[in-house]
From Swiss-Prot:
A motif (Involved in PIP2 interaction) lies at residues 81-97. The lineage of its organism: Eukaryota, Viridiplantae, Streptophyta, Embryophyta, Tracheophyta. Pollen specific. Phosphorylated by MAP kinases. Disulfide bonds join C13-C115. The modification Phosphothreonine is found at T111. This is Profilin-1. It holds the Pfam family Profilin.
Length: 131
C-alpha cells in the first residue's frame, strides 16, 4: 500500500459523517511522504520544533505548535508519543511512529476525539508493523 493510500483511505476517511480538514505522513527528517490536497505547506523549522517536543516533552508549550504558519495552543497529549493542539473550533493531532509523524488537522463539526481516533489508530497500526 502506498503512503498516499494511507492518507486518502485511513486519514481522510469519513468518521460519523465528518472528515479531517487535511492530513499528512511526514518522515522524522521533515520530508513529506504523502499528504492530502489541503495540507498546509510547512517550514523545516516548524517540523524540527515538533520533533524536538517528542524528544523534550513540553518544549512547545510556551510557544505553541506552529504548522504552515498556523499557531495551535498545545493541550495534553502523550509525552513522546502524541502532541495535540487547539485553535478556535479546530485543532491538530500529531502521532509519532518509528519512522514518521502522522498529522491530522480538523475543524468543526469534527471533534478533537474523532481526530485523535483517526490519527492515533493509523499511528498505532504503523508502530505494530515496525514503521
Amino acid at each position: 500500500m502506498s503512503w498516499q493510500t494511507y492518507v486518502d483511505e485511513h486519514l481522510m476517511c469519513e468518521i460519523e459523517g465528518h472528515h479531517l480538514t487535511s492530513a499528512a505522513i511526514v518522515g522524522h527528517d521533515g520530508a513529506t511522504w504523502a499528504q492530502s490536497t489541503a495540507f498546509p505547506e510547512f517550514k523545516p523549522e516548524e517540523m524540527a520544533a515538533i520533533m524536538k517536543d517528542f524528544d523534550e516533552p513540553g518544549h512547545l508549550a510556551p510557544t505553541g505548535l506552529i504548522l504552515g504558519g498556523t499557531k495551535y495552543m498545545v493541550i495534553q497529549g502523550e509525552p513522546g508519543a502524541v502532541i495535540r493542539g487547539k485553535k478556535g473550533s479546530g485543532g491538530i493531532t500529531v502521532k509519532k511512529t518509528g519512522q514518521s509523524l502522522i498529522i491530522g488537522i480538523y475543524d468543526e463539526p469534527m471533534t478533537p476525539g474523532q481526530c485523535n481516533l483517526v490519527v492515533e489508530r493509523l499511528g498505532d497500526y504503523l508502530l505494530e508493523q515496525g514503521m
